[in-house]
Amino acid sequence: MRLIPLSTAEQVGKWAARHIVNRINAFKPTTDRPFVLGLPTGGTPLTAYKALVEMHKAGEVSFKHVVTFNMDEYVGLPKEHPESYHSFMHRNFFDHVDIPAENINLLNGNAPDIDAECRQYEEKIRSYGKIHLFMGGVGNDGHIAFNEPASSLASRTRIKTLTHDTRVANSRFFDGDVNQVPKYALTVGVGTLLDAEEVMILVLGHQKAQALQAAVEGNVNHMWTISCLQLHPKAVVVCDEPSTMELKVKTLKYFNELEAENIKGL
């Protein structure tokens, strides 16, 4: 596992965006051979999306031959709702870059047959071979996507019941009213994430410090689903300074020395 220790949330977003752009450009995608990118929602990736849009406008990257799969979507929330992940992605990213509409894949939380929707999502991912890079965030309790604590590390795309803590955390997007936050969501599984060629997780803020410590220094444990990254051959965790407060000094020193050349100029 790589740990990229940075100072601020803005630096995390810029580093992540630069990494994505470098991966896309090195891949040299075409119509017949697209780059497949997994994407998250929430507050954490906003700085990365902003940086990606700026780099696109500067002519540094094109998304014409990029196919995206989003991590999750609320169940029962109309896609036109301002807090649906469909709306979030268009508002913060898709509407500002040159990605074709047919290349965008989002789970349908209003599908008449939820199980079929989840199966078809997995099948569509497999039809592209694999996701080349999956970017994600992490919850205070260590969840990735909506794989809440005790999720199977072999799980696939499915419906999940959201914990009360997750709904409280997300209520900030619903005028602070937890009762407006859906109780269920569709989410890619831990196994889906582990199938990706590379997984990059962004970690911001002191409230994520325990999750980061569990990911880097703890054991693989389904109560901290972020710890699944230890099983992945190409996992990258990009974090800000407040999120590292639970790490041992020698752990942080080790990764700072290891990644010194990769964090210059931010």
From Swiss-Prot:
UniProt keyword Cytoplasm, yes or no: no
Cellular component GO terms, alphabetical: cytoplasm
UniProt keyword annotation of Hydrolase present: yes
Catalytic activity: alpha-D-glucosamine 6-phosphate + H2O = beta-D-fructose 6-phosphate + NH4(+)
GO biological process terms, semicolon-separated: carbohydrate metabolic process; glucosamine catabolic process; N-acetylglucosamine catabolic process; N-acetylneuraminate catabolic process
Bridged cysteine pairs (disulfide): none
EC number: 3.5.99.6
Pfam families: Glucosamine_iso
Residues spanning the signal sequence: none
Gene3D superfamilies for this protein: 3.40.50.1360
Keywords assigned by UniProt, alphabetized: Allosteric enzyme, Carbohydrate metabolism, Hydrolase
Annotated active site: D72, D141, H143, E148
Family, as annotated: Belongs to the glucosamine/galactosamine-6-phosphate isomerase family. NagB subfamily.
Function: Catalyzes the reversible isomerization-deamination of glucosamine 6-phosphate (GlcN6P) to form fructose 6-phosphate (Fru6P) and ammonium ion.
Quaternary structure and partners: Homohexamer.
Protein name: Glucosamine-6-phosphate deaminase
Lineage: Bacteria, Pseudomonadati, Pseudomonadota, Gammaproteobacteria, Enterobacterales
Underlying gene: nagB
